[in-house]
């Protein structure tokens, strides 16, 4: 069932200073992988801080359908895994709802099993191209039956024995890299991924943590060679999932834009492949203090203290895109309140997200009085400090949670209110968003709930 069955519009209004302390729900990338690797490993995995959005729960259900036992006791998720190489053929198609990450990673995980696995998703996910993950799987011997353009619904028919491959990732995509590495788990010999541009590396770090024989070498040109030896043993682990930097972006930018704000955000994942937004905002003049940086489960974590700041426009280097691809919509909101021009380039990946995210952002900005130019792969925003004259529009979210949250943040600081046409799908990644923002003092109301 798609989220648009009964849309719930929401409106954000100019708010007084946002203040308080919050802990962001767990990182989505790490949450997906915790369920997957815990379900695959031998023995018991215990997870705290898991993001309980619909996307991640769908990944958990898929692992259950293939033999993993998953239960929740208090705040802890406990998984009894099947053991590497021992997943069972699911009886029914695996339904991933809106979750591109869950679907693509699971295709890699199960593709090399000698079994038949079918994948389905909601209307939005069924439009998204899966070829980038399916092509390397085909090289490994997997047969694919898919809807036109390598889209879902699709079925994978695994080979008797998969071939290990060396695969050069043609675009900066952590999902493609991860899918090939996961396919390598059940493949004899060494599977290699060659990655010219580094992307988020949670798969590598976590697989090593679960005991996989995985090595990473970076050559003199900065190209990463990631090798995994197949058919090894994975052992259950204890994981405390740090706060999601992509979700952190919304209260963080809101605190920068709403006058007089002072907000502390606890336990945020600071993995260097994910901090592009914080770096960019600091270049724009944002007052973001990084407190108590520490290591947790092999990942960098810190607390952030954010105070309202006067921002100035910057040119964002295109090579930073992989480390902040999900944050461009909310960066565009920050840029709308900055003095001068902000140029964001290298955004081709945004065209194939939950919506054509680049077009959706540009239309939303225009509807709310922002002077912006949309290019083939770029967005240029000319800001209005203080948000004078901004707002007053309704934004088409196209079932995209990040578009909805970004424009609700805009309405907190713009002169006139901003309305989004639907807010139900925010639950896919950040179910606590509305309550958490209200707790800081944000004026956001679902329409009809004034």
From Swiss-Prot:
Its main location: cytoplasm. It is an enzyme of class 2 (transferase). It catalyses: 3-phosphoshikimate + phosphoenolpyruvate = 5-O-(1-carboxyvinyl)-3-phosphoshikimate + phosphate. GO terms for cellular component: cytoplasm. 3-phosphoshikimate binds at residues 28-29, 33, 173, 175, 326, 353. It is found in: Cytoplasm. Phosphoenolpyruvate binds at residues 28, 100, 128, 175, 357, 402. Its EC number is 2.5.1.19. Keywords: Amino-acid biosynthesis, Aromatic amino acid biosynthesis, Cytoplasm, Transferase. Transmembrane segments: none annotated. The active site is at 326 (proton acceptor). The keyword Transport does not apply. CDD domains: EPSP_synthase. The keyword Amino-acid biosynthesis applies. GO terms for molecular function: 3-phosphoshikimate 1-carboxyvinyltransferase activity. InterPro entries: Enolpyruvate_Tfrase_dom (IPR001986), Enolpyruvate_Tfrase_sf (IPR036968), EPSP_synthase (IPR006264), EPSP_synthase_CS (IPR023193), RNA3'P_cycl/enolpyr_Trfase_a/b (IPR013792). Monomer. Belongs to the EPSP synthase family. This is 3-phosphoshikimate 1-carboxyvinyltransferase. It comes from Brucella suis (strain ATCC 23445 / NCTC 10510).
């Amino acid at each position: 069932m798609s989220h648009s069955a009964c849309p719930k519009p929401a409106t954000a209004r100019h708010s007084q200073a946002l203040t308080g302390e919050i802990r962001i729900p767990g990182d989505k990338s790490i949450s997906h992988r915790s369920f997957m690797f815990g379900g695959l490993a031998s023995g018991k995995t215990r997870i705290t801080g898991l993001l309980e959005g619909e996307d991640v729960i769908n990944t958990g259900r898929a692992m259950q359908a293939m033999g993993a036992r998953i239960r929740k006791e208090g705040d802890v998720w406990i998984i009894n895994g099947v053991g590497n190489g021992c997943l069972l053929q699911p009886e029914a198609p695996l339904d991933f709802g809106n979750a591109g990450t869950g679907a693509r990673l699971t295709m890699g995980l199960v593709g090399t099993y000698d079994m038949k696995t079918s994948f389905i998703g909601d209307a939005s996910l069924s439009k998204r191209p899966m070829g980038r993950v399916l092509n390397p799987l085909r090289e490994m011997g997997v047969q694919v039956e898919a809807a036109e353009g390598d889209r879902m619904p699709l079925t994978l028919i695994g080979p008797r024995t998969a071939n290990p491959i060396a695969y050069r990732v043609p675009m900066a995509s952590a999902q493609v890299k991860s899918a090939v590495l996961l396919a390598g788990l059940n493949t004899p010999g060494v599977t290699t991924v060659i990655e010219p541009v580094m992307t988020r590396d949670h798969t590598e770090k976590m697989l090593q943590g679960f005991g996989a024989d995985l090595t990473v070498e970076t050559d003199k040109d900065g190209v990463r060679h990631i090798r995994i030896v197949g058919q090894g043993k994975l052992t259950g682990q204890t994981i405390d999932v740090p706060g999601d930097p992509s979700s952190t972006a919304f209260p963080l930018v809101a605190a920068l834009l709403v006058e007089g704000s002072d907000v502390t955000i606890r336990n945020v994942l600071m993995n260097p492949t994910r901090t592009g937004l914080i770096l960019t905002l600091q270049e724009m003049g944002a007052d973001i203090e990084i407190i108590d940086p520490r290591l947790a489960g092999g990942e960098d974590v810190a607390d952030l203290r954010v105070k309202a700041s006067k921002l100035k426009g910057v040119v964002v280097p295109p090579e930073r895109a992989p480390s902040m691809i999900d944050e461009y919509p909310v960066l565009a909101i920050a840029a709308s309140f900055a003095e001068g021009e902000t140029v964001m380039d290298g955004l081709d990946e945004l065209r194939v997200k939950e919506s054509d995210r680049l077009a959706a952002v540009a239309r939303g900005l225009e509807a709310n009085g922002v002077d912006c130019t949309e290019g083939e792969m770029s967005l240029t925003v000319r800001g209005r400090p203080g948000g004078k004259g901004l707002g007053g529009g309704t934004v088409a979210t196209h079932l995209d949670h990040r578009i909805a949250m970004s424009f609700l943040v805009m309405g907190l600081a713009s002169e006139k209110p901003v309305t989004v046409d639907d807010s139900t799908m925010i639950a896919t990644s950040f179910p606590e968003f509305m309550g958490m923002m209200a707790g800081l003092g944000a004026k956001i109301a679902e329409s009809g709930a004034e």
